Design a protein with these regions (language model features):
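Alpha-solenoid HEAT/ARM repeat scaffold
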Residues: 16-19, 49, 53, 84-85, ...
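Charged/polar, low-hydrophobicity segments characteristic of intrinsically disordered regions
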Residues: 89, 123, 152-155
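Structural signature of alpha-helical solenoid repeat scaffolds
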Residues: 56, 91, 123-127
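Amphipathic alpha-helical scaffolding segments comprising HEAT/armadillo-like alpha-solenoid repeats
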Residues: 1-5, 28-40, 61-76, 95-107, ...
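N-terminal alpha-helical scaffold/docking segments in eukaryotic complex subunits
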Residues: 1-63
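Long, hydrophobic/aromatic-enriched structural stretches that serve as scaffold segments
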Residues: 73, 77-81, 85, 92
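Conserved aromatic-histidine-acidic binding/catalytic patches
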Residues: 39, 43, 90, 110
Length: 155
């Protein structure tokens, strides 16, 4: 099944999410990622949450699947559930490019669930920092953001 056909099937909420179709979303890049992002905004809101939950679940069960580009692209989605799942999906990512957006979610997202998911995904980087595997400035940014959030009364 082509990506275009699969995206069209995603529109139909009466259809179950197909495992094989979702696997096509692994390692999306370039034009395919661009097309998927454009189609994403026309999907029904409940369907978006279903898709993201399923992708995170697939990622946990199949380590070889890489939905990082999808997660990164959807960190700023309007839907709290989508942002939460996108942040959760990055828990295994060790690419420093996700540090800044995760810190942004941690510090400014209106949803406590999204902020918690961002903090959880940043935890991997704190481990890498302690092991000397990421830049000091990145580790310092993460530490400062976490300490700032911990110091806030409502958190």
């Amino acid at each position: 099944m082509t990506l275009e056909k699969f995206v069209s099937e995603l529109q139909d909420e009466s259809q179950p999410l197909k495992h094989a179709g979702l696997l096509q979303l692994s390692s999306l890049a370039g034009e395919d990622l661009y097309e998927f992002k454009n189609a994403w905004y026309s999907l029904p809101e409940p369907r978006k949450g279903q898709i993201m939950s399923k992708l995170v679940e697939l990622n946990e069960d199949h380590a070889e699947m890489d939905f990082t580009a999808m997660y990164r692209a959807l960190l700023n989605d309007e839907n709290d559930d989508v942002r939460e799942q996108a942040a959760k999906g990055l828990w295994e990512c060790d690419d420093r490019v996700v540090i800044r957006p995760l810190i942004g979610l941690l510090k400014k997202d209106p949803s406590a669930r999204v902020r918690a998911a961002a903090a959880t995904s940043l935890a991997k980087f704190t481990d890498l920092f302690q092991q000397g595997k990421i830049l000091s400035r990145d580790g310092d940014k993460i530490r400062d953001a976490l300490l700032e959030v911990i110091g806030e009364e409502e958190e």
